Structures are given as structure tokens and as C-alpha cells.
């Protein structure tokens, strides 16, 4: 694929997720922090129902599979360990039509392995990213889109290299969906990435943290404007069951969720499917209102099964859901 133009080049860590289904637990609210905690009995043996292992996941691998199923020519830049888990990840990517040309096998390292405590329809993830030596690949032809998401804490020089590449190739459009460690690095550290982004995705809580209003109540219109003022051309902010919002400097749009056909099984990957579908829609020539109408459909489908990729839709199936949408499933202009 090196001499062919890639539509969608995803960059980010690949992981194996082990879903541990637990039932002997409860959720309690931390009144001071306003957060919720998963509580299990301390110092005891806790029974679990079963374990389901899912390979080749993580924000960017999920996005690459999503884009591939929607019909884009897709590749993934990532590292795997020198182990059977890494080999299985490669097999999954190939089965999904994602080019593995830029996947590096790191000698002496393990493949990232996460443990997912799966309780009811939510998950708490125990994460560990290997400190791989990151390097940007030699691309003979610039891709149409780069999709950047979760990388480990030691990846700051890598982010700088990605920023330099996008600066040198202004025809390349960058989507940035920050992962946990990228959020921790903060705006100032990753200012170049924010300012070079064509598309930026986060949720309401993350947006408030980025703009320095973490503990304040804000109108969504103001939050959209402040987030876009950081540099991205198009900002998309999700708000859980309330839906999602987008702003391109001129028009603000609100989109409700696509109704679930049955209660969600597992919410892992809902954000990845949303962001990658929105990006893919733009890459396929769709407008912003059309893109924000596509995205929740794939998220709805993903949460109906275990893992972040099982429910990802083909373009044909997504458009079938769209044609059968409820009357009120329409983007609404809010400015």
C-alpha cells in the first residue's frame, strides 16, 4: 500500500482487552468528587462469571476497523510485542482489511494487555501501556486523513513528529481524539496538535477540563466556542445520553442518540465508533450535519455486543438504519 494513497491512517496504541464479567459488586457515589466508584469486597476472593478476550483494540485500532468497514482504504501505525498476543492482533487487523504495513514488532516487549472489570453495562479498565520506542513511518504518499488517539506517557516526542509531518503536508487532515495520557499532558504541551486538528473530539467533562472550567457550570454553546478557540477547525463534544454537539466556527449542531433496540450490553468503544464514523463520513464527502447523523448509529450498534469492534457497521448497514430512523432523529441547528 506504500505507493497508494491511504484514506484513513490511524495512529495509536493497540491493546488486548480481557473482559472480566463480575456481578458481586456495587456502585457508590463519591459525594465530594461527584464521581462514581466500583466497589468490591476488600481482601476477599471475588467470583466472576466469565472472561472474554478481545484482540487488536484500543482507540486507534477501533477507529481503523470502523473506517475500513465503512469502505475507506485504511492503515494503522502502532507497535505490538514479540509475543502470541501481538501475532493475534496482526491477524485480526488483516481480517478486517486494515493494512499492517506500519505495525512494528518490538523485540523484548509485551503487547499491551488491559483488564476490563465489566459490571452491568459499564466498564472500569485497568490499563498499562508499554514504553515502546515510537517513530513516525516513512510515508511515500501523504494520507488524506490522520486519526490520532491514545498513546503512552513517553510519547511526547512522537506527538511532535506527527505535528511536524502535518505542518509539512498541509493537505493532510488531522483528527485528534485524546486518550487518557494525552488528556493528562494538557493543552499547552500538545498545543501544536490541537491547532493543527481539522477535527477534535471529547466529552463535556473533558472539554471543561481542557478550557480550565472543570468545576463550573457552562452552556454548551460557550463550551463549544472556548474549545474551538484552542485551534481545531471542527469541534465535536459528546454528552452521554443527551447526545452530541458540533461547531465549525459558523454553525452549531445538536444530534440526539439513535435509540437502542435493546438495553446496551457493554459501552466500550462507543466514543471510538462515534469519532471514527464522523471522520469517515467527512472523508467520504459528507457534510457536517450528515456526519453527526451517521456517528450515533455506529455507537448504538457497538454497545449491543461485547468489545469495541464486534458491532461496527458496514456503510450499507449504517445507511439502512438511517433510512429507518425515527422522525425526530435529525440534526438540529442551535445557533
State where each predicted segment sits.
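Conserved phosphate/ATP/ADP-binding segment of small-molecule kinases
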Residues: 163, 168-173, 180-254
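Active-site metal-binding loops of divalent metal-dependent hydrolases
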Residues: 13-14, 151, 273
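Structural detector of well-ordered beta-strand residues that form the stable sheet scaffold
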Residues: 9, 75, 147, 174-175, ...
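Structural alpha-helical scaffold elements that stabilize or flank donor/cofactor-binding regions
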Residues: 8, 138-140, 190-193
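Conserved phosphate-binding/catalytic region of the ribokinase-like
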Residues: 1-9, 28, 214-335
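A glycine-rich helix N-cap at a beta->alpha junction
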Residues: 92-109
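Conserved phosphate-binding/catalytic loop of the ribokinase/pfkB sugar-kinase fold
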Residues: 101-105, 114-157
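Glycine-rich phosphate/adenosyl-contacting loop at the front of the ribokinase-like
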Residues: 1-75, 87, 332-335
